[in-house]
Regions:
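A short, surface-exposed loop/turn module that caps and links secondary-structure elements
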Residues: 33-58
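Conserved short hydrophobic interaction patches
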Residues: 31-34, 84
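Residue-level signal for beta-strand positions within conserved beta-sheet cores that form or flank
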Residues: 1, 43, 54, 74-77
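Enriched for short, Lys/Arg-rich terminal
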Residues: 4, 16, 23-25, 60-63, ...
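Short, flexible helix/strand-to-coil boundary loops that buttress conserved ligand/catalytic motifs
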Residues: 28, 39, 91
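Residues that form or immediately flank small-molecule/cofactor binding pockets and catalytic motifs
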Residues: 10, 49-52, 83
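Alpha-helix N-cap/helix-start and coil->helix boundary motif
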Residues: 12, 41, 84-85
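Arg/Lys-rich, positively charged N-terminal/basic patches that mediate binding to nucleic acids
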Residues: 1-31
């Protein structure tokens, strides 16, 4: 099953802010490929947040990729990339 990828504006803002950190951006794009291959991997933990009850989290160093899998539209929505220290205060 193939999924399309959709990024929210907060993710685009994150990439603009960190465009000089090529190593981090490369690690995030590799994790994107892993998410697209298998979004229900055991490595990606499902969150129990009130605001986003069916969201998952993927770990990339000190950052977390928060994403949602929409089976209806066959798409993965990357909601946000947040630092670990602010991990769940925003959700």
């Amino acid at each position: 099953m193939t999924y399309s990828l959709y990024e929210h504006n907060r993710v685009k803002k994150f990439f603009k802010k960190h465009k000089r950190d090529k190593v981090l951006l490369l690690r995030i794009t590799k994790k994107y490929c892993e998410i697209l291959d298998n979004p229900y991997n055991a490595e990606f933990i499902e969150l129990t947040s009130v605001k986003c009850p069916k969201c998952h989290r993927a770990r990339v160093g000190n950052y977390r990729i928060i994403f949602y899998v929409s089976e209806k539209y066959q798409r993965i929505e990357i909601i946000d990339i947040i630092p670990r220290k602010n991990d769940y205060k925003l959700l």
